[in-house]
């Protein structure tokens, strides 16, 4: 059994999603948003809120793995810089707890969860709800964070399967 904490970083709202993985089965443990605006409008206060929030989630859920979405360089470079700083606050909280960081692009996450890297937010929300058998549709940031965790779960499982096959090839037993 592996517990995965997924993070969808944002300088105002940072989504989080926690799942349990047993082989190729996923179970929902929790999700939501760290609202960084409540501590004030200045960026330093928001980053502190993100750091403290992620640290608390790590204490609460005791994840084995930590996965986070990479920064997308869009039209607004200032927004990308703030997003990078929000990611940094979350990553430092994870590394302070001894967790290894896995990073995935938005396209990789959508591909793993929906089957196409060009999926929209509604498709991601629908698939997260379906895969985790949730009673309702999760809020967008929480759904994205759960998708990050699911992506890591799929990636981690695939890597383990490939490693097992590589060992068999080395031993000359793959059929």
From Swiss-Prot:
Keyword vocabulary terms for this entry: Cytoplasm, DNA damage, DNA recombination, DNA repair, DNA-binding, Endonuclease, Hydrolase, Magnesium, Metal-binding, Nuclease
Pfam families: RuvC
Essential cofactor(s): Mg(2+)
GO MF annotations in UniProt: crossover junction DNA endonuclease activity; DNA binding; magnesium ion binding
Main location: cytoplasm
Active site positions: 8, 69, 141
Cell compartment(s), UniProt: Cytoplasm
Cofactor comment text: Binds 2 Mg(2+) ion per subunit.
Enzymatic reactions: Endonucleolytic cleavage at a junction such as a reciprocal single-stranded crossover between two homologous DNA duplexes (Holliday junction)
EC number per UniProt: 3.1.21.10
SUPFAM superfamilies found in the cross-reference section: Ribonuclease H-like
InterPro entries given in the database record: RNaseH-like_sf, RNaseH_sf, X-over_junc_endoDNase_Mg_BS, X-over_junc_endoDNase_RuvC
A Gene Ontology BP annotation from the UniProt entry: DNA repair
Gene Ontology annotations for the cellular component aspect, listed alphabetically: cytoplasm; Holliday junction resolvase complex
Positions bound to Mg(2+) 1: 8, 141
Binding residues annotated for Mg(2+) 2, in chain numbering: 69
Free-text function comment from the UniProt entry: The RuvA-RuvB-RuvC complex processes Holliday junction (HJ) DNA during genetic recombination and DNA repair. Endonuclease that resolves HJ intermediates. Cleaves cruciform DNA by making single-stranded nicks across the HJ at symmetrical positions within the homologous arms, yielding a 5'-phosphate and a 3'-hydroxyl group; requires a central core of homology in the junction. The consensus cleavage sequence is 5'-(A/T)TT(C/G)-3'. Cleavage occurs on the 3'-side of the TT dinucleotide at the point of strand exchange.
Record-stated family: Belongs to the RuvC family.
Subunit structure: Homodimer which binds Holliday junction (HJ) DNA. The HJ becomes 2-fold symmetrical on binding to RuvC with unstacked arms; it has a different conformation from HJ DNA in complex with RuvA. In the full resolvosome a probable DNA-RuvA(4)-RuvB(12)-RuvC(2) complex forms which resolves the HJ.
PANTHER family, A to Z: CROSSOVER JUNCTION ENDODEOXYRIBONUCLEASE RUVC (PTHR30194:SF3)
Full protein name: Crossover junction endodeoxyribonuclease RuvC
Organism: Colwellia psychrerythraea (strain 34H / ATCC BAA-681)
């Amino acid at each position: 059994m592996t517990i995965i904490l997924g993070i969808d970083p944002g300088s105002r709202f940072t989504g989080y999603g926690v799942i349990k993985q047993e082989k190729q089965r996923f179970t929902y443990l929790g999700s939501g948003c760290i609202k960084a605006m409540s501590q004030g409008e200045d960026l330093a206060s928001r980053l502190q809120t993100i750091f403290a929030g992620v640290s608390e989630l790590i204490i609460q859920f005791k994840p084995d793995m930590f996965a986070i979405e990479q920064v997308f360089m869009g039209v607004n470079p200032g927004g990308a810089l703030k997003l990078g700083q929000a990611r940094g606050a979350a990553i430092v909280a994870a590394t302070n707890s001894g967790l290894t960081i896995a990073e995935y692009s938005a396209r990789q996450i959508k591909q793993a969860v929906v089957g196409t890297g060009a999926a929209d937010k509604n498709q991601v929300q629908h698939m997260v709800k379906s895969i985790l058998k949730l009673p309702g549709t999760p809020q967008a940031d929480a759904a994205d964070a759960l998708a990050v965790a699911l992506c890591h779960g799929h990636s981690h499982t695939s890597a383990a399967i490939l490693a097992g096959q590589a060992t068999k090839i080395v031993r000359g037993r793959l059929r």
